[in-house]
């Protein structure tokens, strides 16, 4: 068998191919050699010469625990325990020379007696090293220029950080390493293949270089500092699942040996890399540096492990998906483990295992924000001072790009081994099961797998259960694609009743359909599967419900006229109070009129919405507007607020409710329009968790609808509803006294802004008729607006006037009739009032001008007040009366605002 000389990779041969490679190398002053092998290396007569020629300056390529060192050190026993603090800095933290200086400053500032610092490669370097391997395997000559880029990156960083002997020494080692890498990559280039050992060796160099540079920078501060090649100490055993398990016994022995030769108060250790028991270089795979730090922390029995990142700590949810996510002050080991498993950017679950054994707390800190205290992960503390001390749920996490596999059939019940057969088939294709849910009836089993693996899983199951499917024992193997998992995590869930109810209630109110549910008996998490498109909205909904953020509503305002504009101003003025005291965030993300609309995902600046509407508004498009308000996945709940009197807009309500958009409106057209449309909307409202509020349709800001509902819901029976429902007509007849003519009072009201631009819209009685129709329907009567008797106060000859001006000009000609009715009423000690009546006993309604005694509540009104009297079974002798302003922009907008807040409370805001 041909033998090729290279540099040492292992201290025993690794049999991976048909060509053994003998690799001599020089480390310090000692020459050793060993055997490694290339897989499927093409035999060539010149292979030895080709590879040997690449070796300019042989250097160490593997673990060297058995080698002598150049510099003798004072022998000493390794002191373990609380005197040690362990820090881990990721690639972003050591991404350039300035950041390495910042890291050194943190290390120097730590007043712990002894410090071990674990570092990753500089940012992107590990990816660059993998890219070198890929290029060499592909026989792409550009690996040489890419390697030069790696050299230059580290050379430039070293020049910026070091000087004198430290710089010369590091650059010499760097150049030697680059030459050896060049030889290794040349061998990979020739073979067209890199074994795992060769790959691990190549990619581990980034950590070697960053550790040496950081150690040199710390020494510039005059401190006793050395660096550790973790391959000399850390021993791991590869597993069948492409992971590694630490060998603590062997690692302890090697650490003791290493420390007797390298005792120092500060040790800078390489993360990510280690050795096998056979001294073959390996890595701890992705996220391995955190794992390295945890293992080292356990080996040194440190008092704390601090993992430095570029975030302030562990968040209650992904802040990219939930903008109001908060940094948690504490997490238990189990909570961190669960959140990591379900995709939270905390730690890899295996990182927690080594430190749990010795109760070593982990602190997640931000290297770019040293003032932030971070998150401590430790054993659960009964009196923990965390965010929301008694919060049963600490946080939420999601996993996307999953598919749900449902195996269903009556033949599964009571048959031993069915579940085993299912998951054996899944294992055979190498698929990873994320979540399992089984019905207690044993009729079905469903589980979630990554979407990229579901095709293989489906084929394996159909093959395994072909006979059972043909025989009817299994009814189907169903694949549900485009799914996501949402998990709620909290150790206190187990001792807190009602957590599940709150969780599922929040999802229901956000109109989220759940595909599958799983919860272990430990109750550390509740897991649900939802549609991928609903995932962010579901996350926001549950996050809000557990008080970890505000209850947030995406608000779309339709009709920014007098009422809508006043509402926007009220929301602007009250926004801060709502957020601070009630945890409600009303985010107006859209405003549309008949010609222009304005939209902003983060929320429109209400201090200048009028200006923005003019400058940035685009052409109005109701369908586009609707999709925008509904499609904002960052806000789980959306509401359309219709401030118009447009029948076309009202016809959209059913579709909005069907799409999960709540509706708030003062527009009377939907509830007083065609009866079938009204019944359809109310039926949908009752069957879904989508809300429809319309208090302002009858009494502006007065609680008319809510009072009526309260009476009915408590078992009272409506006999009669009678009232003055129009603020305009109330004002007219309250001031139609003495010798004043009716036309004079109408002109005065129009001038004061109490009437519509065309007063005939008020005098026709249609507005009152709509309110009577609404109240009749709320009372259970099936009345139609068209069949309601309405007394029109517009004289017939004037109903066809071409303009409001013409009408006002001719109105005095008809004053005599109403003046006569007033005189007759006064003679009888009565007054005229324009009222609407719902007669629930006779099942009819009327709108007419009636006379009331002067001591009647209706006769004692002033201004533009409304008054409504409810005569019921309970309030038969003395009606229940609601009285107050029933018109005006401020009170109407206030009524709409009240409905919006009522919706927020329904959705989980604290009351």
UniProtKB/Swiss-Prot annotation:
This is Bifunctional aspartokinase/homoserine dehydrogenase 1, chloroplastic. L-homoserine binds at residues 756, 767. It comes from Arabidopsis thaliana (Mouse-ear cress). It comes from the Eukaryota. PROSITE patterns: ACT, ASPARTOKINASE, HOMOSER_DHGENASE. NAD(+) binds at residues 563, 644, 888. Residues 407-482, 488-565 form the ACT domain. Keywords: Amino-acid biosynthesis, ATP-binding, Chloroplast, Kinase, Lysine biosynthesis, Metal-binding, Methionine biosynthesis, Multifunctional enzyme, NAD, NADP, Nucleotide-binding, Oxidoreductase, Plastid, Repeat, Sodium, Threonine biosynthesis, Transferase, Transit peptide. Residues 332-557 are annotated as: Interface. GO terms for cellular component: chloroplast; chloroplast stroma; cytosol. Residues 1-82 form a transit peptide. Na(+) binds at residues 695, 698, 700, 702. In the N-terminal section; belongs to the aspartokinase family. NCBIfam families: asp_kinases, PRK09436.1, PRK09466.1. The keyword ATP-binding applies. GO terms for molecular function: aspartate kinase activity; ATP binding; homoserine dehydrogenase activity; metal ion binding; NAD+ binding; NADP binding. Inhibition of aspartate kinase activity by threonine and leucine and 3-fold activation by cysteine, isoleucine, valine, serine and alanine at 2.5 mM. Partial inhibition of homoserine dehydrogenase activity by threonine and cysteine (14% of activity remaining at saturation with either amino acid). No synergy between the effectors for both activation or inhibition. It is found in: Plastid, Chloroplast. Pathway: Amino-acid biosynthesis; L-lysine biosynthesis via DAP pathway; (S)-tetrahydrodipicolinate from L-aspartate: step 1/4; Amino-acid biosynthesis; L-methionine biosynthesis via de novo pathway; L-homoserine from L-aspartate: step 1/3; Amino-acid biosynthesis; L-methionine biosynthesis via de novo pathway; L-homoserine from L-aspartate: step 3/3; Amino-acid biosynthesis; L-threonine biosynthesis; L-threonine from L-aspartate: step 1/5. Its main location: plastid. Residues 83-331 are annotated as: Aspartokinase. A sodium ion is seen in the structure; a metal ion may subtly affect the relative position of the nucleotide-binding region to influence enzyme activity, and could increase the stability of the enzyme. NADP(+) binds at residues 563, 644, 668, 753, 756, 888.
């Amino acid at each position: 068998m041909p033998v090729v000389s290279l540099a040492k990779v292992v201290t025993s041969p690794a049999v991976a191919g048909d060509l053994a490679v003998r690799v001599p190398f020089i480390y310090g002053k000692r020459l050793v050699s060993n055997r490694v092998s290339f897989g499927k290396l093409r035999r060539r007569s010149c292979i030895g010469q080709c590879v040997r020629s690449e070796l300019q300056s042989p250097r160490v390529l593997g673990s060297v625990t058995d080698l002598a060192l150049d510099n003798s050190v004072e022998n000493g026993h390794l002191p373990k325990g609380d005197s040690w603090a362990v820090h881990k800095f990721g690639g972003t933290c050591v991404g350039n020379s300035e950041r390495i200086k910042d890291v050194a400053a943190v290390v120097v500032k730590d007043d712990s007696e002894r410090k071990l610092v674990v570092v990753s490669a500089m940012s992107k370097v590990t990816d660059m090293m993998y890219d070198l391997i890929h290029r060499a395997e592909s026989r792409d000559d550009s690996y040489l220029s890419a390697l030069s880029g790696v050299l230059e990156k580290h050379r430039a960083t070293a020049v910026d950080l070091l000087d004198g002997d430290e710089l010369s020494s590091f650059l010499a080692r760097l150049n030697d390493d680059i030459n050896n890498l060049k030889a290794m990559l040349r061998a990979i280039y020739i073979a067209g293949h890199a074994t795992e050992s060769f790959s691990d060796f190549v990619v581990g160099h980034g950590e070697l270089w960053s550790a040496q540079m950081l150690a040199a920078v710390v020494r510039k501060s005059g401190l006793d500092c050395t660096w550790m090649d973790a391959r000399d100490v850390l021993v791991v055993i590869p597993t069948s699942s492409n992971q590694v398990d630490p060998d603590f016994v062997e690692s302890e022995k090697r650490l003791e040996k290493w420390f007797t030769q390298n005792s120092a108060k500060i040790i800078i250790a390489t993360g990510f890399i280690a050795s096998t028991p056979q001294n073959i270089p390996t890595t701890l795979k992705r996220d391995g540096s955190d794992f390295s730090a945890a293992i080292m922390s356990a080996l040194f029995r440190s008092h704390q492990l601090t993992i430095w990142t570029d975030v302030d700590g562990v968040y209650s949810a992904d802040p990219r998906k939930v903008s109001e996510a908060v940094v948690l002050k504490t997490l238990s080991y189990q909570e961190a483990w669960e959140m990591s498993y379900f995709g939270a950017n905390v730690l890899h679950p295996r990182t927690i295992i080594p430190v749990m054994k010795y109760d070593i707390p982990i602190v997640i800190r931000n290297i770019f924000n040293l003032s932030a205290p971070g998150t401590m992960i430790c054993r659960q503390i009964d009196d923990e001072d965390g965010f929301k001390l008694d919060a049963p749920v600490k946080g939420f996490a999601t996993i996307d790009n999953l598919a749900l596999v449902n195996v269903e059939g009556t033949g599964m019940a009571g048959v031993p081994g069915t579940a085993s057969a299912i998951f054996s088939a899944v294992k055979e294709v190498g698929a990873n099961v994320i979540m399992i849910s089984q019905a207690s009836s044993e009729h079905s089993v469903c589980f979630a797998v990554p979407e990229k693996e579901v095709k293989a899983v489906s084929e394996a199951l159909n093959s395994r259960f072909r006979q059972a499917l043909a025989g009817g024992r299994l009814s189907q193997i169903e694949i549900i694609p485009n799914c996501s998992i949402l998990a709620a995590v909290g150790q206190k869930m187990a001792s807190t009743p009602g957590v599940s109810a709150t969780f599922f209630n929040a999802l229901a109110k956000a109109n989220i359909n759940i595909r599958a549910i799983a919860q272990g008996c430990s109750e550390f998490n509740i897991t649900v599967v939802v549609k991928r498109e609903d995932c962010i909205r579901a996350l926001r909904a549950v996050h809000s419900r557990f008080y970890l953020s505000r209850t947030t509503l995406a608000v779309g305002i339709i009709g920014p006229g007098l009422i809508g504009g006043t509402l926007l101003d009220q929301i602007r003025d009250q926004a801060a109070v709502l957020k601070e005291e009630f945890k409600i965030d009303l985010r107006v993300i859209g405003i549309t009129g008949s010609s222009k609309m304005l939209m902003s995902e983060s929320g429109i600046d209400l201090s200048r919405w009028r200006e923005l509407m003019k400058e940035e508004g685009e052409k109005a498009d109701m369908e586009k507007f609707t999709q925008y308000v509904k499609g904002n996945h960052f806000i789980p709940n959306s509401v359309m607020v219709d401030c118009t009197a447009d029948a076309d807009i009202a016809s959209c309500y059913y579709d909005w409710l069907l799409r999960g958009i709540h509706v708030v409106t003062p527009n009377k057209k939907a509830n007083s329009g065609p009866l079938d449309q009204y019944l359809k909307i109310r039926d949908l409202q009752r069957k879904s968790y989508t809300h429809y509020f319309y208090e302002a349709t009858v009494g502006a800001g007065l609680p008319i609808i809510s009072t009526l509902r309260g009476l009915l819901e408590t078992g009272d029976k409506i006999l009669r509803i009678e009232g003055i429902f129009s603020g305009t007509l109330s004002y007219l007849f309250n001031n139609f006294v003495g010798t004043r003519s009716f036309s004079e009072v109408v002109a005065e009201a129009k001038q004061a802004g109490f009437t519509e631009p065309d007063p005939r819209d008020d005098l026709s009685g249609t507005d009152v008729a709509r309110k009577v129709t609404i109240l009749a329907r709320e009372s259970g009567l099936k009345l139609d607006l068209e069949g309601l008797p309405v007394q029109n106060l517009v004289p017939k000859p004037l109903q066809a006037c071409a303009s409001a001006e013409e009408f006002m000009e001719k109105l005095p000609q008809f004053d005599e009739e109403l003046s006569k009715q007033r005189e007759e009423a006064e003679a009888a000690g009565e007054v005229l009032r324009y009222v609407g009546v719902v007669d629930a006993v006779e099942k009819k309604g009327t709108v007419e001008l009636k006379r009331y005694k002067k001591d009647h509540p209706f006769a004692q009104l002033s201004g533009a007040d409304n008054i409504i009297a409810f005569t019921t079974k309970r309030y038969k002798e003395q009606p229940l009366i609601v009285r107050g302003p029933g018109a005006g922009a401020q009170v109407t907008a206030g009524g709409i605002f009240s409905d919006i807040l009522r919706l927020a409370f329904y959705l989980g805001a604290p009351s």
